[in-house]
Structure formats: C-alpha cells, structure tokens
Amino acid sequence: MLVWALTTEFVEVVGIGLIGRIDALEVGGRSLAFWGLGQVGVAIKGPTGVLYVDPYLTDSDGEGGSLPRTFPPPLLPAEVSNASSVLLTHAHIDHTDPDTVLPLSEASPESSFVAPFTSRDTLVEAGLDEGRIVVPEVGEPLEVSGPTVTAVPSAHTELEYDPERGYPYLGYVIEWNGVTVYHAGDTVVYDGMVETLSAWDIDLAFVPINGRDFFRTRRNIIGNTDFRETAELTEILDIGLIVPTHYDLIEGNTSDPGHFVSHLYATNPMRPHKLLRPGELLLFVREADR
C-alpha cells in the first residue's frame, strides 16, 4: 500500500523561494520529495542530499534557436547551490545544457554528474572538469551521495549502442530511502524494455508523453512515447504513481496531458497519477511494502 501527499505551490516568478523551499523541507522515512522543473527536469530530495535530473534552466535553444520556452525556468542555474548529484540522460540541449550545468557546478562545487558518454563529451568540451563526471555501466548499481542509481537503456527513437562507448541515451532507476523511482529521460518502448524494468517494483515513474510524428521528425524534433504507450507501460509495470513528462516546455513540441489522463483512466481508473507543474512539490510516502 502506498500513501502520497502533495502541495500545489506554483512558482510564477523566476527563482522566487524555490531553493529555500527545497532546503527547508525535511524528508522522513520511506519518503522522497520531488519538485518539477519543466520538460523532464526534476529535483529529488531524500533524507540527505538533493539529486537533479536533466535540469534545463535556460533558454539556450530558444535564443536564436528553433525551440523557445513556453514559460521561464523556475530556478536560475547559479541558484542551485544544493545539488549533491546531477543525472543527465542524453546530450540534447534540453537535457544536457552547458549553460545550466556549468553555473550549477560552480554553485554546487561538491556535486557529481552521472551521464552517458555523449553528455560527457559535451560537458568536457564546454569546460566541466571530467573528474566530476561518471559514465555509468548499464545495469550496474552506482552509489551517488545517498541514492543508489542504476542506468538502463533508453531508445530515442531507436535503441542505439556503441560497442566501445555504450548507450548514448539512458534512463535511471533511483533507489533511495525505501522508494524506487524510474526516470526515463527521452524514450520510446523497445524490445526488452519491460523485461529490464520488471526487475524493480517501481513506486513512481517519470515517462514522456509527447509522442512523435512525421512533421516534428522533419523539423529534427525526435519523438518519444505518446500518451497511450505511457499509460499502457504504466499498467504493464504496475507503477505505483505515474508522472508524465515532456509535454509542457518547448513550443511546437507540446502535448495535452488531458489525453494522457483520460487514456490512463480508461485503462485503469484506480491508477494514481500526477501532473507536476514547474516549482510544485510532490511528497511521496511509502506506507508499507507493495
């Protein structure tokens, strides 16, 4: 049985109070706290430390680029002074953004970065000390300042593998304080994905719903699972609470989360879900073993 609670504070002004709110919250047993950062980004706090996943806190691809933001970042990179570790899933700029990572690394000088080789190359070229970057072995648990993190392959949109360097796209299973979290990064469902993830009883998962189509692919917007696939994956894996991602931030690559909620309800009206807004807190509490 699971119990989860949430607040609904929304940060409407850039950076106002969010770091202070993260720092002030105390996390008890069998619990984790999550704050949405937009796109797939999330800050996760356990009893000790704060883990960030794919923080994209600038408009790097909108300023002169083709993918402007639909809302400002809830934090500025230089404000992130509490990061113990940062997980990066792949090298696309809305997931591995040097203009976010470098100021963040200076504001959190003890932080480490877990990333696939593609993201590592991007960050080393941008000037990040390569000694702070860990390229994980897929399937091998890694201790990172509190949680245990296991990298799993993601397919965006094909399952790619370099025999010398590994997988360019990763997801992560995070085990921390009695709670198991799956963060997919960007992915589609691929052969073997369900079998890989079935090794864990996943309490909470972050999975994209923006889908893919011919016209976005032609504009070099690479797709992900759509709302139907994510709902069905949630049921197959019996995920305790599903948080859809990758539907809100980038102009021309948004998706109506209401379609996901409707399809999930049609699939299983008892399945817990949460639309996590930027700056909003989700406090997840595991009452007992599943």
What label would you give each PLM region?
Residues 1-52, 57-61, 66-67, 236:
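Zn-dependent metallo-beta-lactamase
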Residues 7-29, 115-179, 263-288:
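Metallo-beta-lactamase
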Residues 44, 54, 90, 97, ...:
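Divalent metal-coordination and catalytic microenvironments
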Residues 48-88, 98-106, 159, 189-199:
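Pre-active-site segment of Zn-dependent metallo-hydrolases
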Residues 49-51, 84-85, 147, 179-181, ...:
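Structural motif
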Residues 60, 92-96, 120-123, 140-143, ...:
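Active-site environment of divalent metal-dependent phosphoester hydrolases
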Residues 74-142:
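Active-site HxH/HxHxD metal-binding segment of metal-dependent hydrolases
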Residues 112, 118, 188-278:
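Cap/insert and terminal regions of metallo-dependent hydrolase folds
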